[in-house]
Amino acid sequence: MDSKFLNLSVGDWREVMIHTLGPSGTSSEAAAGFFTEWLGQRFPESQVQINLSDSYEHACSAMDERIPGVLIVANAYPQIHNFYMNPRLSLVATFVFDTPEYGLVSKGQLNTRKLTIATHPAPLMLIQELLPDGFEVDSVIFSLSTSAAAAAVARGEVDVALTTEVAAHIHGLQFISKTRPIRMLWSVFAPIRWNTQPVEVSARYR
């Protein structure tokens, strides 16, 4: 597991709150579980809780700087630069973690060949790769997460969603395509005060 980790300054925190993208069933939740496992091996006495938010931005806002906490963000997220540039945050670790299986799911038998598909923006390119023969994309609806995309199918708002096997199971959906994971790099941010090795500003810029 350590071979997939770059630990820059994760501390021996006794209680840690992990903030990331929800709801339950997202790849981010799975990545948070992987990070929890790493913490347990590195710091056996750590007690970890996971807090899921409907966006990475809301997850960041939910962090309480008075207690140890981290924000886990997929590097495929188009706006991840905002967290790297945030003066309140520091990058404390990165790790490689393959997502759960991704695929196209439906609620039942499809009555159309022209599909309205819900997806999070990040894995958009997978739609054409996974789309079964005989179907075409009529429109794409962006959701806040892959799990939210699955929920849109369950509510009958769209025909199909690009989502994870975990979210498909939660919402009782079935795959209509082949599936595959995504090899992903994840960034772990913490409030500056919990960074054990803060970045030093060069004297020439002070």
Predicted stretch roles:
Residues 1-206:
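Domain-level signature for soluble enzymes in the chorismate/prephenate branch of the shikimate pathway
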